[in-house]
Amino acid sequence: LKGVHIENHRIILRLNSPLANRHFQQIIRKWYPQETDYALFSETGKEDSKAVSIAIPPATFNALYIFLHAFVHFLNSGIGLRQLCDWTCLLANRHKEIDATTLLRQLQDLGLLHAAQAFGYIAVTRLGLPANRLPFPLEGTKQIGEQLLEDILSTGNFGQHDNRIKPRPKGYWAGKWYTFCRATRRCNELRQFAPYEALWYPVTLIGGTIAIQINRLKGVKDKKARTKK
């Protein structure tokens, strides 16, 4: 669509914890495509012959997913207030369509309720979201909520404004080691938000690097085999 920017992802999202990721993939399979909503988009803003029907997730899933997407980036490198504003706007404007009981249970099953409460604390105390738009209480969340806010203001979007971080080395393996050390250190500092996600993130980095090297070796072997033919 003209004027609409679309960011394509190969997968919706993958969590670091194997158990949590299994739960999340099951949640995806539950609503897609059985409970998919459709919206009509056109350049005129009206329903006409050029209107395009686009599949969109139900509001309850979006309330979970937008939080998860922001949290994964927060744990990896940092986020700006923009990501939290996206989630806050959804909760404020679509709350009647969100099944609060289901959303709460999903956050608990994924081990991310504590992290969501920290996000909710900022949404209510700083961004003006009415507390009754959240599916969980905020009692006892001030400390972790303020810690999240401090990190957001210190690191910025994807950690781009974090003056404490040294530049990434240019070499391939030096860069990989830099990323691993930075991720491990950050996960250790933020483990109280989501212990299992923090524990498994460095492991997934190692697994991803190994997978890349295996695929490269396979590619080299396949190329040699084709050359011989």
Per-range role (PLM):
Residues 1-229:
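Conserved NTP-donor binding/palm subdomain of two-metal-ion nucleotidyltransferases/polymerases, i.e.
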